Amino acid sequence: MYKLIALSGLLSGLLLSSSVFAEVPSRILFGSCSHQDKEMPIFKSIIQDQPEVFVFLGDNVYGDTEDMSELKQKYKKLGANSGFKNLKEQAELIAIWDDHDYGANDAGKNYPEKEASRQIMLDFWEEPENSPRRTREHGIYTSYTYGEGEESIHVILPDLRWNRDDIAHVTRSEYSNERAPKNMGPYIPDNTNSATMIGEKQWEWLEKELQKPGRIKVIGSSLQLLADFTGWESWANFPADRQRLFDLIKKHEVNGVILISGDTHWGEVSYYDENLDYPLWEVTSSGLTQEWKNVSPNKHRVGQPISTVNYGALDVDWEKQDPVITLGLYDETGDVVNEHRFRLSTLEPYD
């Protein structure tokens, strides 16, 4: 386990909004969408791959309720799963939520039990009682820093639920006749620039996080960020927010950004280099138990998607003078289905 230097509390008199660990991992695995009522044999392969850190990217249980006693029982069922317990003994577990563990399908800022749900979620993931995640007015967003200097990874986990504005959608007939045949969802992007997914306070936090130390910056998004508009939930429904993130990366000359995401019930790798100073990679891993055969179109996809259960990997070979990064997707048996390897220097255009 990693030695914790500071966790969302006081260090040298300064209030921190992140956790700081002394050691840098060489293998981070991640996944999303684990239904507590289903078997989870994929955890056996994950454990065999020996992650140092595992990131749960949302829909970690399928709560879908306003009954908080029911939500607690669903978390309890996940916690009792033998594969989950074994992973917890082996790796550092960190987590953000998505809609189903937040409380309702595709829910946003108007979900009525979000405060109670927050405490149940953070209790399950053993967040300290004095953590700012428990009391912030604008969500459970947080970050983690591993290592320091030339060998460091900064994991940023925004909260895409707490402040998310409502999303417009097409009519039932339009969805059935036009969207569904194309494997697309019912939602419509907000092109007015008035709607937001995370809210202004969280944007202020995120801008500061992007400027913090960390040679590799992993943004763990519960929803896809680079993919084309699919009609399902994603950053594409909030194009102003999506562009704002790209602009902040350029404005502050942030090197080393890599994106990981969940939600979709299929896995894929995306590559985006439009109007940026270096390419962005995104690995979408979903789900640990959930599957969806009708994969939506995505012009940024590289390699083949996987429509069965899967998990993602970020490996860093720190032994190389120019560290080698390997991004991958793995199936239930631990076999690689999509893998990409590149030098860290390709993500470092800024001095």
Task: Enumerate the language-model features and the residues they cover.
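Bacterial N-terminal signal peptides that target proteins for export
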Residues: 1-9
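N-terminal signal peptide c-region/cleavage motif recognized by signal peptidases
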Residues: 17-18
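Metal-dependent phosphoester/phosphodiester hydrolase catalytic core
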Residues: 23-351
